[in-house]
Amino acid sequence: MSTQVPQQTDETDAETEPDAEEEPSKGDLRREKKAERAAEREREAAEADPLAGEDTRELKVFRFDPEVEGKQEPRFDEFHVPFEKGMTVLDALIYARDTYDSSLTFRHSCRQAVCGSDAMFVNGQQRLACKTQLSDLSDPVRIEPLPHADVRKDLVVDMQHFYDQMDAVEPYFDADELPEDELEEQRQSRANRETVKMSTRCIWCGACMSSCNIAAGDNQYLGPAALNKAYRFAMDEREGESRKRERLEIIEQEHGVWRCQTQFSCTEVCPKDIPLTEHIQELKREAVKNNLKFW
Amino acid sequence: MASNTTYEHDVIVVGAGGAGLRAAIAAQEAGADVAIVSKLHPVRSHTGAAEGGINAAIRDGDSWEDHAYDTMKGSDYLGDAPAIEALCRESPKETIQLEHWGMAFSREEDGTVSQRPFGGLSFPRTTYAGAETGHQLLHTMYEQVVKRGIEVYDEWHVMNLAVTDEDDPTDRSCHGVVGYEIRSGEIAGFRARDGVILATGGMGQVFDHTTNAVANTGDGVAMAYRAGVPMEDMEFIQFHPTTLPSTGVLISEGVRGEGGILYNGEGERFMFEHGYANNDGELASRDVVARAELTEVNEGRGIEDEYVHLDMRHLGEDRILDRLENILHLAEDFEGVDGLEEPMPVKPGQHYAMGGIETNEYGQTCVDGLYAVGECACASVHGANRLGGNALPELIVFGKLAGHHAAGEEFEEPEIETGKRGDYEDADFEAPVTLGERAAGADAESTADAAADGGEAVTDPDAVLEIAVDREVAQVEELLEGDGVNHAEIRSAVQETMTANVNVFREEEGLKEALVDLREARDRYDDVGVSDPSRTFNTDLLHTLETRNILDIAEALTMGALARNEFRGAHWRKENQIRDDENWLKHTLISWNDGDPDLWYRPVILEGENKRYEPKVRSY
Ligand SMILES: Cc1cc2nc3c(=O)[nH]c(=O)nc-3n(C[C@H](O)[C@H](O)[C@H](O)COP(=O)(O)OP(=O)(O)OC[C@H]3O[C@@H](n4cnc5c(N)ncnc54)[C@H](O)[C@@H]3O)c2cc1C
Ligand code: SF4
Ligand code: FES
């Protein structure tokens, strides 16, 4: 299986685990009862087939919850949803959750491909659930959390590592000089805006990182999204030469650009069509130029 | 679920959209130790979905005074001049500030930022970054938050405010918030030494066809309401004229700004041919266009009895790719339409809440130490109808003012009064059913107001916070205990009645029906239960909490709509087809008085710094 389920890994995790020493508390008993009831409902739903005769799609959805007995062992649940033209994977998941099992858990918000919260592994590829039409997928639709990330519950993964890598490239604009007049622009040429434009479109969904073999093998590799973020600033003419050099130093470190083996998997999955591999190559070129200048 | 953790900061900002991030930066600049608590990671906030642009008078030939005039006219004279003038005066500086922070605006040949025309504006003053202005703004601002090392508690859902217990809300003060960590299920207090700034965004989920995110459930508005802060002008909901029929995804006004044309099913350019807006046509203000489209559909000239067409093909591929590229993707991904080859289907959808938490021009509410900014707030800059491109400046201008104010900077006396004091007027309002929570019976206790349930007055800040935390712990326990009605059923019942009865066109009978339906939904909420027993990422529980907020907001919105028996801006009333300035140049305010909603009014302030804005007939 491509997904990593945490085995009580880090400390913060342990802190939130129920205390095993104590007598079973009222809460524990209640939770047990609830789990039973949930299982019962599931059985009932499976037996009755309210959708008989409708045009339906089958979802096979990854389930895991470290808190709930019966879900601690990862498994796949099947849900049948009525199909309508235009229906996305996210619509289908919402239908399954609201109709069959309200504990089915996934992140989502904008449902228009801008918040980046619903990247998942759908039929073997990283995709935004909201941007993926069911009609483009073969049945059954297999939905898993992003590979190479710790699963918190069902389709929700821990994004912390991704955020940390983003942070590592100093992901903020640092202008060389600002106009004294606070009403005057520092200006950017149209051509320069075009150069950085695609790189500014990243929505932090994490699909690229999850698809990257190198990132999977090297936990410290900055990864495509963070390198793209570095590109966004390094190539912005307004930052000035010395800041650019500092930025190139960050991405040239051991776990930086040189790890990229141009496999293009990040570029393939990016829902924003950012030419990630190209940007990384461009950074390599810049780094070489930078070195030539100095050595 | 025992927890004793308390986090403490000078200023706590709830929400990390454009408004929250700007407020946090400002508070930090003013020297405060500030933290952001947000149920979504900042970059997931809905500000990222904004497309069209930011209005700012930054060019020769334009002036902030003209911007203020357009805004007052657009508001149908229901805006308060001190707030509108602050918005328009500060917007240029704040917009250029974003440019200084590196925002990737679209550019002119000389490298200055581009501007384009937008509906209801007398000058092309909408500054933009392609058709993804909000995304660029949100990320730029978050970058600055990272740069400054401002603490962010992300995926923490704020459940309630810690507000003192005095009888009169204007005597109360806010000392913090209660948060629920989504990842662990931990409930903790966040103590704010100087102030809490609510920036929780829109409430689109009250309706079922909306451009808003699923997370836009109006939490901040509902929390403030239950803590005794009035909600202002809730009846004014903007329905955007161009949303995709199947999802509600927005097609930016930028399309019409660039010259996109609306056609009905008979191929007529109806904005002109049927006389809806003989001067401005497609660029008339949003309420006018939304009504025109629905009228076409209702009179049988729609397409598939549902929508009309928005055509941009004639603009040419180059211009579309340069300025509206994102629109092509949206139409393709969410409606399967190629905007270069075909016209796009569009219909009106809920888009923006003009009303919200009553604030003055600095974002202060009537509760000491409690601020609100962004879409959840109503400083009264949009009045009865918001102009496109006026919400993003609101985030940055009022975000900054509130941040500085909360951090203790000195300001002049506010000109806008808040809370039930001064020249307010009680309303004569009759509802068809009992409103609010009272009728729900004895159990209502569990979901009571903030700390404002009339008990013994506790004033020690730590104790106030502790009480608030205990109450939420108890509430969560109870919700997890009960195995009752699923929140999704209640939520969709609310959305259905709101869409059927409190939509673009409104009439008395339907509004009353909506109140009856909402009463029923509220009663069912008494039996709500969470079936997921987990403490890890329990979205079942979260959605249940949000549904309570949706209920309270829907009720207030409908009350306001029923009370205001006139036709103004986005609020259309069948019974009364005129704007009635004699009786209605006033705001509706609804406050939660120990479980009962109470409706009253306050006059609009048309007196600006140097002039008075005289109401005129609004024609486009
Ligand atoms: C599709 C679309 C396009 C738009 N285009 C434009 C445009 O072109 N120009 C313009 O001026 N305006 C536009 N608007 C309006 C404008 O974008 C919004 O009004 C504005 O972005 C709202 O920003 P905000 O900071 O108030 O809220 P949001 O960006 O919605 O942020 C809300 C924040 O609050 C947090 N939050 C909510 N509840 C809780 C809770 N209980 N606990 C903790 N945190 C919570 C969320 O996590 C989020 O971080 C558009 C709106 C939409 C929907
Ligand atoms: S680069 Fe693309 S795939 Fe990677 S996080 Fe950004 S949007 Fe997602
Ligand atoms: S829900 Fe926001 S990207 Fe899919």
Give, region by region, the residue ranges found by the protein language model:
Chain B
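Glycine-rich loop(s) and the adjacent beta-strand/alpha-helix scaffold that form part
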Residues: 195-249, 382, 388-405
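Glycine- and aromatic-enriched mobile tails/lids
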Residues: 2, 18, 26, 30, ...
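An anion/pyrophosphate-binding glycine-rich loop and adjacent beta-alpha core
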Residues: 229-337, 405, 446
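Core beta-strand elements of the Rossmann-like FAD/NAD(P) dinucleotide-binding domain
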Residues: 6-9, 184-195, 365-369
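Short beta-strand to alpha-helix junction loop
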Residues: 79-92, 125-143, 153, 210-218, ...
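Conserved redox-cofactor binding core of oxidoreductases
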Residues: 94, 101-186, 193-195, 199, ...
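Conserved N-terminal glycine-rich FAD pyrophosphate-binding loop of Rossmann-like flavoproteins
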Residues: 40-72, 76, 249-253
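N-terminal Rossmann-like FAD-binding beta1-loop-alpha1 element of flavoenzymes
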Residues: 10-36
